[in-house]
Amino acid sequence: MANARALDKRRKSIRNIRKITRTMELIATARYKKAMDRAAAATAYTEQITKIVSRLADAGLDVQHPLLEQREKINTTRVLVLASNRGLCGGYNASILRTALPRIKSLRESIPNVIVDASGKRGVNGLKFRGIETEQRFLQFEDQPAYDDVEKIAEGYLAEYITGKIDRLDVVYTKFISTSKQEAVIETLLPLGSLGDESDSASDGSDDTNAEYEFLPSAESILEEVVPTSFKVKLFKCFLDAAVSEQVARMIAMKGATESAGDMIKQLSMTYNRARQSQITGEIMEIIGGVEALEG
């Protein structure tokens, strides 16, 4: 039987760990709620941008924009991997890497130049461990990505695409579907595609398909602003989804750790009680034996 004092010491240690994991769970829950509110607001903004694009498409415009053009030959592509700066979030980062690695491998088999960028220390280190070096590393993002920071990254990608330095941009991130479901996905953000593709989701269920719109100063000038903004908003939404999913993963992981610690404490308490009972019984038997020896 294990020593009662050692069991009690271990039980106290696990209780302290449970306090830490419980605190981290509460912090992750609070951060999740804040991140969720920001993601919901960004979703509403994205929908409005999509509606504007839909109306431009409904206007029957014959317009061209560099971001809408499909390249006949892809020579250079960038892959942006969105991971976290911190751990203790379950399989969040492992899932991202499992999704990113096959895509990077397949792209390198068919495209001459594949450049990998990463957001988050865990992503950078995870890729490096697997022999993949990253060119750009974005380590400033935590649980609340700022639009200004993402906009700078987006403008860099836009400039590279327009000047022909890259022909494609893939983003690997965890898409937030619900509190119980988050999925690591890959989205091609550049090129954006056609106006018609942009308008598919916005036109569903709309009741103003027969309305006529007047664009001032012109539909073309609006398009020049809307198309780059559409890309920036989409990239920002990827960062927000990743942030929400990270907090959900951490919240679930810490909740599981807290519950496991509770189960271990119960088991150790039972073992401690048995050990203590055995120790007391032994001491009583020693006393009885001593008394009998004195009487004899």
From Swiss-Prot:
Pfam families: ATP-synt. It comes from the Bacteria. GO terms for molecular function: ATP binding; proton-transporting ATP synthase activity, rotational mechanism. It is found in: Cell inner membrane. One of its GO terms (cellular component) is plasma membrane. Coiled coil: none annotated. Produces ATP from ADP in the presence of a proton gradient across the membrane. The gamma chain is believed to be important in regulating ATPase activity and the flow of protons through the CF(0) complex. Belongs to the ATPase gamma chain family. This is ATP synthase gamma chain.
